């Protein structure tokens, strides 16, 4: 008996389709409910109106631009922080400008999937986008640090439903066999927001004001919102029209008890990571208490989710399926490595190599462009060959190699090498970026796709938040050791407080001092050590890829058109 059949027999919420792959049952289905060899999602796939031509382009452009703005907003603030803290005299609030955004986004992420599965996709998306735009406006007009933090929290709440909402819209607008291509375009272009943030933010801060780092979302966002208002957005499944009676009926199904347990647990974990080693020692009662509180709350949450079953915010039958959790691990490892690298490559190019913020952004283009090209190309190839697992494994393997060779960066690495190394790294990321999404879309019935995507994006963002902190710990600890070894006359506290710009590093030693090379080597080696972490993450994603299922998506596509 093969692996797929054994899995289907073990899980009462999984049915086997005639295409040969396991598929999670829809609401109310039990094992054995599928009496004929017909995929229950086939009818909805056949009956759903497919969008083509200019309307499809407009929908894809709208959600891609919205996701780009959302990811840009998460990375653009870094270069604006020095000016913000100077105006508000709020150096102690630096961590909260990022933390408020991530905490709010992480807390609402899983619930957003349940909301999409219950209400109109179009209006739910516009609701989350409106929250994001409102948060951007509050940040732009903020007259105090507290107001700015509040605006970041509102924007974070809005961002929780944008990336998964965009993929839900794409899933409803195009047939399954074309989703890899369109999802690749969507992810490839929107992910540019992560790496373009410092470049765009640096230009806006330098030539206008830091407030335009937030104002930029308003006019661009207005265009995308107006487009969506006048476009017909197909649904994955039929949904009733919005009424207050519908709200009263749906609210009990949203698992708000699960949300009230999950949100504090996620917030406590992230707060412990932000406080640990910064405001409080890692072994302090505050940090330990937060971790313990999070652990207890997660246990209670897991017990509650198990009790409510498929009505849960994160259905246990879904997340316990091998394809779902291995896809989540693979995707989380990839996205975490992207987010961490986006922080430390600029340190290498600005601090070690001496480039300004704008040229530092230009120097990362080899990785950005190769990632954009391969994420689209991999989607086309999956559509042709049908199997996503080889691309998931290859993407993680190439990413591991790319992160490994980046550890060879030094203050004197030739231009040809740092360009080539980034091309290898970007290619690996691009190849594997959308494979987890394809696996989940292929596995889940239409009514569960939004929940599955929301769960996966939560795992990616949560892993990113965790490993950004881990990367910071590694970098800081290594910098202390490296400064003592290569520039002993430089005070460690001064090096840690200097920042990572070209001028600040070179100000640590007198002009013409021979120890300047030691300072640059110390920072370069510290960045290299962070990429050892990213290499390990990529290897973890490589191992997880082999659990994502050897499934030919073309068989399902064929069955849905017969």
Swiss-Prot record:
It holds the Pfam family MFS_1. Belongs to the major facilitator superfamily. TCR/Tet family. The lineage of its organism: Eukaryota, Fungi, Dikarya, Ascomycota, Pezizomycotina. It comes from Penicillium decumbens. Induction: Expression is induced in complex medium (Czapek yeast autolysate medium) supporting calbistrin production. Expression is positively regulated by the calbistrin biosynthesis cluster-specific transcription factor calC. PANTHER family: MAJOR FACILITATOR SUPERFAMILY (PTHR23501), MULTIDRUG TRANSPORTER, PUTATIVE (AFU_ORTHOLOGUE AFUA_8G00940)-RELATED (PTHR23501:SF193). This is MFS-type transporter calB. GO terms for molecular function: transmembrane transporter activity. Disruption phenotype: Leads to an almost complete absence of calbistrin A and calbistrin C, and a decreased abundance of decumbenone A, B and C in the extracellular medium. The chain crosses the membrane at residues 57-77, 94-113, 123-143, 154-174, 184-204, 213-233, 256-276, 284-304, 329-349, 362-382, 389-409, 418-438, 451-471, 530-550. It is a multi-pass membrane protein. It is found in: Cell membrane. The keyword Cell membrane applies. Calbistrin A has been reported to possess a number of interesting bioactivities including antifungal active against Candida albicans and cytotoxic toward both healthy and leukemic human cells.
């Amino acid at each position: 008996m093969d692996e797929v059949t054994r899995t289907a027999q073990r899980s009462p919420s999984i049915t086997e389709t005639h295409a040969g792959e396991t598929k999670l049952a829809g609401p109310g289905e039990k094992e054995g409910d599928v009496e004929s060899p017909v995929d229950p999602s086939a009818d909805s796939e056949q009956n759903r109106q497919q969008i083509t031509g200019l309307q499809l382009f407009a929908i894809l452009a709208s959600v891609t631009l919205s996701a780009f703005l959302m990811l840009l907003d998460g990375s653009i603030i870094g270069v604006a922080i020095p000016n913000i803290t100077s105006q508000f005299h709020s150096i102690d609030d630096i961590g909260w400008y990022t933390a408020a955004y991530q905490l709010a986004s992480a807390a609402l992420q899983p619930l957003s999937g349940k909301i999409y599965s219950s209400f109109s996709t179009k209006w739910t998306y516009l609701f989350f986008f409106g929250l994001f735009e409102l948060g951007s406006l509050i940040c732009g007009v903020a007259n105090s640090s507290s107001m700015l933090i509040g605006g970041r929290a509102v924007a974070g709440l809005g961002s929780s439903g944008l990336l998964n909402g965009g993929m839900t819209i794409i899933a409803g607008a195009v047939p399954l066999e074309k989703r890899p291509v369109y999802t690749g375009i969507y992810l490839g272009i929107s992910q540019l927001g992560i790496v373009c943030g410092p470049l765009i933010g640096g230009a806006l801060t330098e030539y206008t004001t830091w407030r335009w780092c937030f104002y930029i979302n308003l006019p661009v966002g207005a265009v995308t919102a107006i487009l969506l208002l006048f476009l017909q957005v197909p649904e994955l499944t039929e949904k009733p029209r919005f009424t207050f009676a519908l709200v009263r009926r749906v609210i009990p199904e949203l698992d708000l008890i699960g949300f009230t347990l999950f949100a504090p647990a996620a917030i406590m974990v992230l707060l412990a990571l932000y406080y640990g080693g910064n405001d409080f020692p890692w072994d302090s009662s505050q940090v330990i208490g937060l971790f313990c509180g999070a652990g207890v709350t997660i246990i209670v949450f897991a017990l509650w989710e198990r009790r409510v079953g498929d009505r849960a915010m994160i259905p246990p039958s879904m997340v316990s399926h091998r394809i779902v959790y291995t896809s989540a691990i693979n995707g989380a490892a990839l996205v975490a490595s992207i987010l961490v690298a986006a922080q430390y490559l600029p340190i290498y190019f600005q601090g070690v190599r001496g480039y300004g913020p704008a040229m530092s952004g230009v120097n990362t283009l080899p990785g950005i462009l190769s990632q954009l090209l391969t994420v689209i190309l991999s989607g086309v190839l999956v559509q042709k060959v049908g199997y996503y697992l080889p691309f998931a494994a290859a993407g993680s393997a190439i990413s591991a190699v790319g992160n490994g060779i980046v550890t060879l960066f030094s203050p004197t690495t030739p231009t040809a090498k740092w360009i080539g190394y980034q091309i290898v790294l970007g290619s690996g990321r691009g190849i594997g970026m959308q494979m987890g999404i394809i696996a989940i879309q292929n596995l889940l019935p239409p009514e569960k796709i939004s929940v599955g995507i929301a769960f996966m994006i939560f795992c990616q963002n949560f892993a990113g938040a965790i490993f950004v902190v881990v990367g910071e710990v590694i970098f800081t600890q290594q910098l202390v050791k490296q400064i003592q070894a290569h520039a002993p006359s430089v005070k460690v506290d001064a090096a840690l407080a200097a920042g990572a710009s070209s001028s600040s590093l070179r100000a640590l030693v007198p002009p013409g001092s021979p120890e300047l090379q030691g300072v640059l080597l110390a920072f370069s080696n510290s960045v290299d050590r962070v990429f050892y972490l990213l290499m390990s993450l990529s290897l973890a994603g490589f191992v997880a890829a082999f659990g994502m299922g050897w499934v030919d998506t073309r068989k399902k596509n064929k069955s849905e058109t017969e």
